[in-house]
Amino acid sequence: MDVPAFKDAPPAQFRFYIIFHKFLTLEAYENVNPHYIKTYCRFAGVNRKIPKIGPDTLAPYVFEEWQLPVYNPLYQLAKYCESSVFFHTYLNPGLMLDPFKFVGFLHYDMVLDNRLFEFIEHCLEELKDSSKTLFNFYADAAEPHINQNSVNNDRFGYELWENVINLYNTMHGTEFTLDDVRTNSIPLYHSYLVPKGIFKEMMAFAERAIPRIFDLLGCDTTHLPYHIERCHGVFLLLHTLDKKIDRWVQLPGIDHRDDLKDPWQEQQTA
């Protein structure tokens, strides 16, 4: 299947997929050299039910998930939200993953500038071995994120995450506990740049973990997007404790702007 946004891209060590539901704005990229957009960025539209709006100058770099060779609309129906781009990247490796050493994800409401790309280029040039490096935008203490209790369903809290941690232990031969996660921080916002091999391991884990989370949520998708985001973060933390990631590097040049948020959630279910 021909996807124009992927044609004639310059060779690159990393690729960011910038996720949007409804619109893109030039304001978010007016301080980015067009070379960096062409080389390192593609804009991923999700949820086919929502019409897309964007400036003509970005159009050559925009694609929608339904255009991909392997496409599953059920991810959006099941409220995978941003994570549907993660899965479609994983399921279309020849197009979206394998040409690069790193793959990353950002969002339409983040204002970027040249520092982001210059910094990553510098790090990849200077680091002798970057294969265990996680570039992250934001991390927060894990405890408040994994202790979300509900009057009607206590499984929203620790029991759910103990199941997730035990699955990681089974898959990776480790013995991590809830306390190992509770006392550390996790990356959030679906916003990071990950080595290709680690991303593949993260998604292999997510394929098995997310159905379990859905089941533990009483087969209700209401809170599933929240938990999927934390699931990715917990995996990246456990991989760090497992010494498969040896450093977290803070990304500069990203301003997460609430005033650019798309009110799509008020009209549609993603």
Model-derived features with residue positions:
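ER/Golgi luminal nucleotide-sugar-dependent glycosyltransferases, focusing on the catalytic module
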Residues: M1-A270
